[in-house]
Amino acid sequence: LQNVLGKWPAAPGLEPAAALILAVHLEAVAKLPTGELIGFHGQTLSHDPQNFRTHQLGDGSELARQAGVAVAWDFRSEDVARGGQGAPLAPIYHWALARYKQMQEPVAIVNLGGVGNLTWVDARLPPERGLLAFDTGPANAPLNDFMLKTTGQAYDADGALAASGRVDTQVVATFLQQPYFSRPAPKSLDRDSFGDMAGLVAQLSAADSAATLTAICVAAVVAGLPLMPVQPKQMWISGGGRKNCEMMRQLAVNLPMKVVDIDDIGLDGDMLEAQAFAYLAARVARGLPTSFPATTATKAPLCGGRLSLP
């Protein structure tokens, strides 16, 4: 898949990667209990919403045919075609989760994956008025890249290396001067929007580098606080970042609200994204909106995605 990143549909050499994506999804379907509907995200190879185009590799119609199950897929194209960013798409699921937890006040849900995403939810309101979403900035991606290059480890286990170092506050402050952080929400990034961030910490020790890259993730979340319509009393953390003890410690120290590992309230922080696309699939099947002006900057609520029958 690394060899086809950045390619658009007409590019040569996509067939082996498409076949691999189909095969692994068919394998997963075979291992799971039989369902009535599959939400199939595909693999994003290229994303250029400024020019109204996005490309997720994977043929949902072929998956439906071979799996014998209806498939909702191609969730982003319609949003991008109508002037939206095509991301993030999980916020409507976050709204449903807040309703499920019977929240009677606004809450922020932050997913710390390669990039950080924040959804502000007021579940007392309909999604057209009770949602705001944006990408906060880099999260695990630069730290993981640094760890792999420097130590051979895929990530900073428990945040141990970062916890042993000192944050270079000047590096953090300089990074936050980038124009992205002064833009209004909604706004989105991809994993490589800020380029190779290793150069920011090239003069620091390994421990100080890890501490500083962790602090950048936290500072980006803090920088997003003024964008929320009402400051929530809780922030639920999902994604791999919640397993980084130092990252969670820094969030708790620097945020004015209670920071909660989403697992601690009975939700599954590892499966949230997969669950979100199952939920999106159900909405597509019913013709319900999957994105909104305050989540992707689309001009009106719309139902993205295609539905393919077996």
At which residue positions do the language-model features occur?
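Short glycine-rich, Thr/Ser-proximal phosphate-binding strand/loop in the N-terminal lobe
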Residues: 1-12, 128-131
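Short beta-strand-loop/turn "lid" adjacent to the catalytic site in phosphate-handling enzymes
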Residues: 8-60
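Phosphate/ATP-binding catalytic cores across multiple sugar-kinase/actin-like superfamilies
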Residues: 24-32, 206-231
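Short helix-loop-beta connector
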Residues: 34, 103-105, 229-233
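Phosphate-binding/catalytic loop of phosphoryl-transfer enzymes
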Residues: 49-54, 65, 69-153, 303
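Conserved ATP-utilizing enzyme core subdomain
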Residues: 126-218, 296, 300-310
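Glycine-rich phosphate-binding/hydrolytic loop that grips phosphoryl groups
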Residues: 215, 263-310
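Glycine-rich phosphate-binding loops at beta-strand->alpha-helix junctions
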Residues: 232-252
